[in-house]
Amino acid sequence: MKIAAPLLLACLMLPSTASAADTDAASGTSGPLFDTVAALDRTVFDAYNRCDLETFATYFVPDVEFYHDNGGVTWTREDVVEGTRKYICGKVRRELIPGTLRIYPIKDFGAVEEGEHRFCQRASGQCEGVAKFVMVWRREGEAWRMTRVLSYGHRAASEEEMRAAAAAQH
C-alpha cells in the first residue's frame, strides 16, 4: 500500500509534464502529420469536386469500407467511385468547415482524420448540407490511402451556417 500511493501520484503527474508542442499534437490540430493529412484531404476533395475520378480513386484501397448514415455501406473502391460519379459529379461541391479538422496518429499504420464538412449545390451555390466525417488513412511507403470512411450526422445547414458558407465563398 505504501508503494501504491507514490506510484499513483507519479502516474497522475505525467500528463501535466507534457510540452506545449505535445499538447498541440495531441489535440490533432498541428504538426507534420496534420500538415500531411490536411494536404491529402485537400487533394482528394479537389479531385472529388472536379469529378477527376481517376485521381480520386487512387486515394482508396481496393477494399475500402465507406459507411454513410443515409446511403448505407459501400464495400469497394469501384463502388465508391461509381457512387461519386452517379450522385456527386456536377451536382455537389464539398467544403471542409474551417477549424473542425483533427488528425491523430495510428502507430505503425497511418492516421485518423475527423472533421465536419458542408455540401454546396452547384446549380444554386447554396451550401445546404452539413455532416461529420472520419477517415482512416494507411501509409505504405510514401503513399497514403483511405481504408475506412464514416460520413454521418447529415443534416440541413442552419441559416447561420449558410451565411458563413456564403461569406467564405466571397
Where in this protein do the model-derived segments appear?
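Positively charged n-region of N-terminal signal peptides that target proteins for export
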Residues: 1-4
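Hydrophobic/aromatic beta-strand elements that line small-molecule binding cavities or substrate pockets
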Residues: 80, 84, 98-104, 116-119, ...
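Short, well-ordered beta-strand segments in beta-rich or mixed alpha/beta enzyme
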Residues: 65-69, 110-121, 135-136
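Bacterial N-terminal signal peptides
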Residues: 6-16
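Short beta-strand edge/turn micro-motifs at domain boundaries
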Residues: 130-160
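Short, low-complexity N-terminal intrinsically disordered segments enriched in polar/charged residues
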Residues: 18-62, 78-79, 160-170
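A solvent-exposed, acidic/Ser-Thr-rich amphipathic alpha-helical stretch
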Residues: 31-35, 53-109, 127
